[in-house]
């Protein structure tokens, strides 16, 4: 796992087309913005896990996708 430190307003790049920007920090919550092409699915982990379970792929463990 790559671990990075970013401040509010700073961005990181994933490949050539996906950006993740830190929008704000409040207590133990971090607001992030993700810009990605519409053909790239972006989900919170718990939503992704639910989608996989509904597809019958319930054997996907968190962090193993």
Swiss-Prot record:
Belongs to the CsrA/RsmA family. One of its GO terms (molecular function) is mRNA 5'-UTR binding. It is found in: Cytoplasm. It comes from the Bacteria. Keywords: Activator, Cytoplasm, Repressor, RNA-binding, Translation regulation. The gene is csrA. A key translational regulator that binds mRNA to regulate translation initiation and/or mRNA stability. Mediates global changes in gene expression, shifting from rapid growth to stress survival by linking envelope stress, the stringent response and the catabolite repression systems. Usually binds in the 5'-UTR; binding at or near the Shine-Dalgarno sequence prevents ribosome-binding, repressing translation, binding elsewhere in the 5'-UTR can activate translation and/or stabilize the mRNA. Its function is antagonized by small RNA(s). GO terms for biological process: mRNA catabolic process; negative regulation of translational initiation; positive regulation of translational initiation; regulation of carbohydrate metabolic process. It comes from Vibrio atlanticus (strain LGP32). InterPro entries: CsrA (IPR003751), CsrA_sf (IPR036107). Coiled coil: none annotated. Its main location: cytoplasm. This is Translational regulator CsrA. GO terms for cellular component: cytosol. The keyword Transmembrane does not apply. Homodimer; the beta-strands of each monomer intercalate to form a hydrophobic core, while the alpha-helices form wings that extend away from the core. The keyword Repressor applies.
